[in-house]
């Protein structure tokens, strides 16, 4: 759809991959750019604004686990610019011992954010259609024995995104939904990784996974910005070791109608 002239909302835009993507987005002549994050980083917001002074950058303190915070943040966007054209759901954590928090941020929060945005973007209601990109992971496509809870949350993102990208919904609302799956990337998610595994037994296989080849957040962020510019409804995109590719999931079952 292209980003030029669009109003963009980025949830979790001050994280490593998110921030690198935000820097790329600011070169695309977007109309306005809203960054939702739980922690404010005034220096990063100022740096984003400096990339393109013509694009107004807004920061909103945002708690993705709180429905009131979600509703308030989106209402503020509509009050300021009337329309949302692009939503990026990029908030995420890796901490398997805290099952509830992992699910609340990685999956439930993402679902609630999406469901809040859809009526505002729906061309038959208050919006003019647009694009939602949900950030999952390659561990939403393949199992991750050392991080089973994180993996489950990302599989949930994948299932949710694929379901709401059904052409039936797209044709009604004009909202395309795509999924972006980073491979292993050098971010703070890897910090103190031994404390984040599912079981104490997970350390051996977890440390082995943690020592595999990674990519820089700059490369992953650039890929995400590219997807935002070119994504197709239902598209699933992997950013891994500096390469961006589109994947077609295997179909294991289809309903047989009477």
Curated annotation (Swiss-Prot):
Enzyme class: oxidoreductase
Chain positions recorded as NAD(+) binding sites: 9-33
Keyword NAD: yes
Keyword Metal-binding belongs to the record: no
Organism superkingdom: Eukaryota
Coiled-coil regions listed in the entry: none
GO cellular component: cytoplasm
EC number: 1.1.1.1
Active site: 150 (proton acceptor)
Gene3D superfamilies, alphabetized: NAD(P)-binding Rossmann-like Domain
CDD domains: ADH_SDR_c_like
PROSITE patterns: ADH_SHORT
Molecular function per GO: alcohol dehydrogenase (NAD+) activity
Disulfide bonds: none
Reaction catalysed by this enzyme: a primary alcohol + NAD(+) = an aldehyde + NADH + H(+); a secondary alcohol + NAD(+) = a ketone + NADH + H(+)
Binding residues annotated for substrate, in chain numbering: 137
Similarity-based family: Belongs to the short-chain dehydrogenases/reductases (SDR) family.
Subunit structure: Homodimer.
PANTHER family: 15-HYDROXYPROSTAGLANDIN DEHYDROGENASE [NAD(+)], ALCOHOL DEHYDROGENASE-RELATED
Record's protein name: Alcohol dehydrogenase
Origin species: Bactrocera oleae
């Amino acid at each position: 759809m292209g980003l030029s002239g669009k109003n963009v909302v980025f949830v979790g835009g001050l994280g490593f991959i998110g921030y690198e993507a935000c820097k790329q987005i600011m070169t695309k002549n977007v109309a306005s750019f809203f960054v939702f994050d739980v922690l404010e980083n005034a220096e990063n917001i100022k740096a984003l604004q400096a990339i393109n002074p013509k694009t107004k950058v807004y920061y909103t303190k945002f708690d993705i686990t709180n429905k009131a915070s979600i509703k308030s943040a989106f209402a503020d966007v509509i009050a300021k610019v009337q329309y949302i054209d692009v939503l990026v759901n990029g908030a995420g954590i890796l901490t398997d011992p805290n099952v509830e928090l992992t699910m609340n941020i990685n999956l439930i929060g993402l679902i609630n954010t999406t469901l809040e945005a859809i009526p505002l973007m729906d061309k038959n209601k208050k919006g003019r259609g647009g694009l939602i990109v949900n950030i999952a992971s390659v561990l939403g496509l393949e199992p991750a024995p050392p991080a089973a809870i994180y993996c489950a949350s990302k599989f949930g993102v994948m299932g949710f995104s694929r379901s709401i990208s059904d052409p039936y919904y797209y044709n009604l609302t004009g909202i395309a939904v795509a999924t972006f799956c980073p491979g292993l990337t050098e971010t703070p998610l890897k910090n103190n990784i031994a404390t984040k595994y599912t079981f104490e037994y997970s350390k051996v296989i977890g440390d082995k996974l943690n020592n595999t080849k990674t990519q820089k957040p700059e490369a992953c962020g650039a890929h995400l910005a590219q997807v935002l510019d070119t994504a197709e409804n239902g598209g699933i995109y992997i950013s891994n070791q500096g390469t961006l590719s589109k994947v077609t999931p295997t179909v294991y079952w289809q309903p047989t109608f009477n």
